UniProtKB/Swiss-Prot annotation:
SUPFAM superfamilies: Acyl-CoA N-acyltransferases (Nat). This is Putative acetyltransferase SAR1027. Could catalyze the transfer of an acetyl group from acetyl coenzyme A (AcCoA) to an acceptor substrate and release both CoA and the acetylated product. It comes from Staphylococcus aureus (strain MRSA252). Pfam families: Acetyltransf_1. Residues 1-141 form the N-acetyltransferase domain. Belongs to the UPF0039 (ElaA) family. It is an enzyme of class 2 (transferase). GO terms for molecular function: acyltransferase activity, transferring groups other than amino-acyl groups; glucosamine 6-phosphate N-acetyltransferase activity.
Length: 144
């Protein structure tokens, strides 16, 4: 269901999902949504019957750590385990790419979801694009 993005059309599908979720639903400015890290990130896309429904990206921070960013599931596909499957695919990709630690700036409303996946909060709540976030981290192991 989830694939590593390998062509411009797949990347456009990622941007479509992100625009729907972050720009249209959450009010993030469109000019902030696509950033300077797109080309150095590894993107994942999930399709359902040929329609793009979920995406995330990972960005190397150093030799051992990857930052998980832009995690998004289209509204019609939430509450069905899609987010959990997406995060499992993200973690698998990160491990396949040789990373041992994952970090992310999680939206605070999603803290329980990420805690259920064994991410731990670190630091204090901060605002990003007017939305409360907190850093969360996880050691990636082969036992996921």
């Amino acid at each position: 269901m989830f694939s590593k993005v390998i062509d411009p059309e797949m990347l456009e599908d990622c941007f479509y999902i992100r625009k729907k979720v972050f720009v249209e639903e959450q009010g993030v400015p469109e000019e902030s949504e696509i950033d300077e890290y797109e080309s150095e990130s590894i993107h994942l896309i999930g399709y359902d019957n040929g329609q793009p429904v979920a995406t995330a990206r990972i960005r190397p921070i150093n030799e051992t750590t990857v930052k998980i960013e832009r995690v998004a599931v289209i509204k019609s596909h939430r509450g069905q385990g899609m987010g959990k499957m997406l995060m499992q695919a993200v973690e698998s990709l990160a491990k396949d790419e040789g990373f041992y630690v994952a970090t992310m700036n999680a939206q605070c409303h999603a803290i329980p979801f990420y805690e259920s996946l064994n991410f731990k909060m670190r630091g204090n709540i901060f605002l990003e694009e007017g939305i409360e976030h907190i850093e969360m981290t996880k050691k990636l192991t082969s036992l996921n």
